[in-house]
Amino acid sequence: MPGLDEKRGTQRQHILKAGTISFDGSGIDCLVRKMWGEGANLEVESQIGIPNSFDLVIDSGHSYHQCHVVWRKARRIGVAFD
């Protein structure tokens, strides 16, 4: 039986890097747990106030992605890159 990553068609990389959810001149810290070509899995302290579309900044600005929320669960957010 194929694994979940095989079914998804894209390898997800466990990266555990600090990130910032940036929107409307504000920023919320997050942990980027997994990332792949089309999206990422984020962990946050609280989802309160996080909009459905935002910019994700990783590694102090070395990586930047416009993204939108695909799913939310407790402290985790799944996003797709635009």
Which sequence ranges carry the predicted segments?
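Structured alpha-helical
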Residues: 1-82
